[in-house]
Swiss-Prot record:
Keywords: Cytoplasm, Cytoplasmic vesicle, Hydrolase, Magnesium, Membrane, Metal-binding, Nucleus, RNA-binding. Pfam families: NUDIX. The gene is NUDT1. Mg(2+) 2 binds at residues 52, 55. It comes from Canis lupus familiaris (Dog). Residues 3-132 form the Nudix hydrolase domain. This is Oxidized purine nucleoside triphosphate hydrolase. The lineage of its organism: Eukaryota, Metazoa, Chordata, Craniata, Vertebrata. Its cofactor is Mg(2+). 2-oxo-dATP binds at residues 8, 33, 35-38, 117-120.
Length: 156
């Protein structure tokens, strides 16, 4: 395994629904996902998460709650993705489509797992139960999980 790069993922999770975005271009295009991306130099992880949410959905947020951290390895890629996962139930603004993402609300019993990253169906249940977690997923290409670990933790 090589070096890692910091990424963020933000889920707007309200009592009956979750906001996801359809990725329109780049890494993960054609899949529903939370909002996030690379943390920029000189930026805290949380500030990066807030910036990505604003850029991709038009929403602003005061408080984020860190709920998980997952390391992703893609066979053949030298860099690991160190993804810090946040959620919030309170945002300002109305979701708007950006050049990268098309936001849409989903009822919690209608989350489109078949059109999401394959790992989401493993850790989303922990997120919905308001549990914190650490994970590692090793992928062969974008669709095949070769190996994974996922555990609930008390704190991150």
């Amino acid at each position: 395994m090589g070096t890692s790069r910091l990424y963020t993922l933000v889920l707007v999770l309200q009592p009956e629904r979750v906001l996801l975005g359809m990725k329109k271009r780049g890494f993960g295009a054609g899949r529903w996902n939370g909002f996030g991306g690379k943390v920029q130099e000189g930026e805290t992880i949380e500030d990066g998460a807030k910036r990505e949410l604003r850029e991709e959905s038009g929403l602003t947020v005061d408080t984020l709650h860190k709920v998980g951290q997952i390391m992703f390895e893609f066979v053949g890629e030298p860099e690991l993705m160190d993804v810090h996962i946040f959620c919030t139930d309170s945002v300002q603004g109305t979701p708007v489509e950006s050049d990268e993402m098309r936001p849409q609300w989903f009822q919690l019993d209608q989350i489109p797992f078949t059109d999401m990253w394959p790992d989401d169906s493993y850790w989303f249940p922990l997120l919905l139960q308001k549990k914190k977690f650490h994970g590692y997923f090793r992928f062969q290409g974008p669709n095949t999980i070769l190996d994974y670990t996922l555990r609930e933790v008390d704190k991150l």
